[in-house]
Amino acid sequence: MSSPSNTSAGFSREGKVKRVYDVSDKEIEFEFTDRISVFDKIIPSKIPFKGETLCREGTFWLKEAEKLGFLTHFMKMTDKNKMLVKKVNIIHDYSKINHNTKNYLIPLEFICRHYVAGSLHDRIEKGKIDPKELGFGKKTVAYGEKIPELFIETSTKLEPVDRPLEKKEALSISGLTEEEYNNILETIIKVDSKMSKIVEKGGLIHVDGKKEFGMNEERTLMFIDVFGTADEDRFWDKKLYEQGQMVELSKEFVRQYYIKTGYKTELYDAREKGQPEPDIPALPENMIKQVSDLYINMYERITGEKFR
């Protein structure tokens, strides 16, 4: 497969792990690199094959969403770690977005949680979220418990730091009507239901993940970016979960490494005090191999396809 970026595409912008190229007025190309980041810090280590696994996983899920009848911005893969997608306008000024705006990125992230994990567990522990809000009939819940009622949160997408939003503000800044907002929630529920069934075949539990959307030129909802990858979502091993073990099978594995080394505490202390942030150390060679193997293994378990 040849890449438009080799000839006609102009470099547009670079994220922590993804490069974006302008191909035409209506197309952009994503290049998924082998870089890896945690806590908004790019680790100075490359993970072999990581970019390819994420691109192929993202393609897999976008096609699954299309099978359910939903629109996506996906057009085609142009290389092992690249995909061509429809271009939408990115509007940073919320005042310029309204109910009539078309062909734009909805400036929201939707985080769908099926189990108590990550930051949700932290907020429950600190009393910031009442378990009753999640459908629990008790005051205390343990890490790893299945949430009785699917919990979908919304945060900002285009601000320097993602900020949690109540529904009223989410509607205000996104130009969405209440009906469109509810349509997004229903779309997420349907897609996540299929995701859970598919990954269960690979012995996985889909714990949580985020999704992004845009409106096309007819102002019809479509999936933007990728979802369901080992970077975007959290997965646990089903057999081990049934034995009471929540084994991280996604980028969380790398986060846990830096938590154990004490780096996360050091970093967040510096951020709270407004001090210079410490550089994130490189991963040791044995960890790089483990992480690369993890991404390949996750690709095969998520999609049911052989990597090679």
Where are these regions (language model features)?
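Catalytic activation segment of kinase domains across protein kinase-like and atypical kinase folds
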Residues: 211-257
